Amino acid sequence: MSKTYHFIGIKGSGMSALALMLHQMGHMVQGSDVEKYYFTQRGLEQAGITILPFSEDNITPDMELIVGNAFRENNKEVAYALRHQIPFKRYHDFLGDFMKSFISFAVAGAHGKTSTTGLLSHVLKNITDTSYLIGDGTGRGSANAQYFVFESDEYERHFMPYHPEYSIITNIDFDHPDYFTGIADVRNAFNDYAKQVKKALFVYGEDDELKKIEAPAPIYYYGFEEGNDFIAYDITRTTNGSDFKVKHQGEVIGQFHVPAYGKHNILNATAVIANLFVAGIDMALVADHLKTFSGVKRRFTEKIVNDTIIIDDFAHHPTEIVATIDAARQKYPSKEIVAIFQPHTFTRTIALLEDFACALNEADSVYLAQIYGSAREVDKGEVKVEDLAAKIIKPSQVVTVENVSPLLDHDNAVYVFMGAGDIQLYEHSFEELLANLTKNNQ
C-alpha cells in the first residue's frame, strides 16, 4: 500500500538515499531542508521529489515523518510535530524496521563504508533484484527485491537499531571526537553492533582493534596476510586499476579486477567477495560485475578541466587522506600530487592535528581551506587552520575561495580536493580560474 513520507532534512546523504528508495517503491515522497545547495539534491530533483523550505505547513496528518539525525527540537518542523504529538521516526530507527523485510547486507567501519556499500550494491544488483542505500545519497528501491544493501553508521551509535543478516566492518579508528571519548569507546560501540549481526561478519583481519570484536555469529577475517580466512594475493596495481586473486582455506576462489585505485579499494573488494562467497553467490558473476564498477559520488571523483586533472574526495580523516593520495599516485605515478584540504569540524581538527599533518605530508604540495565547523559546534578560537599549516613539512599555504590562484604554480600536477564541508566551492573557483585563463589565451 502506497504511503506519503515527509523527510525533515532530506538533503542528508542517508536521508536522500532513503527518499529515492521509497519513491522508487511507489510511495509519495517529499522533504524539507536548508536552501544551501548540497550534492545529494541533484538526484532528488531528477526523480521529481519536491524539496521545500522548512515550514509547519509542510506537515499534514496523513504523512509519515522521517527526521534526519542532525535536526533537533529547535527545528520548526520537529517542534511542530512534538507540540501536536505527531509521531515521527529518526532515520536510523526507520531503517532498522525497514530492513526486516529483506535479507540485509550492512557495511560498517570508520572508513570506506560508502565505497564498499557502493561496490557491494553494484555487484548484487547486477546479479539479482536488490534494493540499496548508499551514503553518497544514492538509493534504489524495489518492492520485489530479496536483498537490501545499506551503509551502517557508528556516529552516536546510530547503527544500534540494525540487525542485519551479514555485515562487513572495514576498520575501527578514532573519529567523531565530539561524541566518542577515545578508541576504546569506538571499539565498544562496534562490539555492541557486531553482537546484533545474525549470520556472519566480515572484518579486516589486520586491524588490531577489530580483532578484539566478539560476536555470536561467525567472524570471517579478510586481508593480505596469511592467517586470514579470505586472502588477497598476486596483486598488480596499474594505471587501469587493480588485479588480484582471493583464496579461502587454501583454495583459490577467483581472479578479480577492480577499476579502482589504492590498497584500500583492494581490501574493500575482498570484503565484498568474502561476503558474497559465504552468501552463496556465484564467484564468476561477482568477478564479471566487479570489473564494471564506476565508483560512488565524492569518492575519488575525477574530471578534466582544460587539460588539468581534478579529483574530488570526501576524505576528512587522516587515514582517508593517506588512502586517497595513495590512489592518486597509483593512477598518476608521474605527476605531482597537489592536495587541497579543508578540515571538517574544530573538534576533529584539535583531536587529530598531528595526524592530519603527517597524512598531508604524503602529498607533494598542500593547500588548506578554512576549517568547516559543523552545525553542532561553536568556534571557540582553540584551533586555526594556520596551526595545521605550521605542522606540515611539505610546501603548504592557506587559500581562500576568492583567491585560488596559488594553485596555478604547478606543472604536470593532479589536484586532489578533499573534505566533508564546502571544499567543492574551492574546487569550483579553481575550475572557473582555469576556464578564464583559457578564454584569455584564445
Curated annotation (Swiss-Prot):
Highest taxon of the lineage: Bacteria
E.C. designation(s): 6.3.2.8
InterPro entries the record matches: Mur-like_cat_sf, Mur_ligase_C, Mur_ligase_C_dom_sf, Mur_ligase_cen, Mur_ligase_N, MurCDEF_pg_biosynth, UDP-N-AcMur_Ala_ligase_MurC
Cross-referenced SUPFAM superfamilies: MurCD N-terminal domain, MurD-like peptide ligases, catalytic domain, MurD-like peptide ligases, peptide-binding domain
Major localisation: cytoplasm
GO CC, any one term: cytoplasm
Protein keywords: ATP-binding, Cell cycle, Cell division, Cell shape, Cell wall biogenesis/degradation, Cytoplasm, Ligase, Nucleotide-binding, Peptidoglycan synthesis
Pfam family, one: Mur_ligase_C
An example molecular function term from Gene Ontology annotations: UDP-N-acetylmuramate-L-alanine ligase activity
GO terms for biological process, alphabetical: cell division; cell wall organization; peptidoglycan biosynthetic process; regulation of cell shape
Protein residues bound to ATP: 109-115
Enzyme class: ligase
The keyword RNA-binding is assigned to this record: no
Location within or outside the cell: Cytoplasm
Pathway where it operates: Cell wall biogenesis; peptidoglycan biosynthesis
Reaction it catalyzes: UDP-N-acetyl-alpha-D-muramate + L-alanine + ATP = UDP-N-acetyl-alpha-D-muramoyl-L-alanine + ADP + phosphate + H(+)
Matches recorded under PANTHER family: UDP-N-ACETYLMURAMATE--L-ALANINE LIGASE (PTHR43445:SF3), UDP-N-ACETYLMURAMATE--L-ALANINE LIGASE-RELATED (PTHR43445)
Similarity annotation: Belongs to the MurCDEF family.
Role description: Cell wall formation.
Protein name: UDP-N-acetylmuramate--L-alanine ligase
Protein's organism: Streptococcus pyogenes serotype M18 (strain MGAS8232)
